[in-house]
């Protein structure tokens, strides 16, 4: 499921932002529902030139989206209004000089593809530190992308 779609990017580095959020699914997502969600995300993100990665574990989503400021904000507004999840909390947002996932319209991992303890540690660290989110830890979850 870690399929991605290359996106043509015409970006000025000073206009790029990255936003990472955590949310809770209203109901657990089965494989078919996750695949449908990813298909929709990849289509919408391709239209907006938004790239990123999504983790799903134990009924929780953690997603990093990146792109032009306005496109990321439109995408995030769409995410917040989605009734399939609740308690959407921004963990980190910042201007970036380059994308972390330039070729992924939406990378994906479930708890089978990521260490659950790592996900929990990231969330705990982010909760304690409002100033800085450990983005490198999040990115390491995708370092063994063999899909």
PLM regions: where:
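Charge-rich, low-complexity N-terminal segments
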Residues: 2-147
């Amino acid at each position: 499921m870690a399929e991605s779609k290359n996106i043509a990017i015409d970006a000025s580095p000073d206009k790029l932002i990255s936003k990472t959020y955590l949310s809770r699914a209203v109901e657990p997502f089965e494989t078919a529902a996750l695949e449908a969600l990813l298909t929709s995300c990849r289509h919408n993100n391709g239209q907006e030139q938004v790239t990123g990665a999504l983790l799903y574990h134990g009924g929780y989503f953690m997603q990093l989206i990146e792109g032009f400021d306005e496109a990321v904000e439109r995408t995030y507004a769409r995410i917040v209004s989605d009734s399939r999840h609740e308690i959407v909390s921004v963990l980190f947002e910042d201007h970036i000089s380059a994308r972390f996932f330039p070729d992924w319209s939406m990378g994906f991992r479930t708890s089978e593809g990521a260490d659950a303890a790592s996900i929990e540690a990231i969330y705990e660290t982010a909760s304690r530190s409002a100033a800085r989110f450990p983005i490198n830890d999040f990115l390491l979850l995708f370092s063994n992308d063999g899909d």
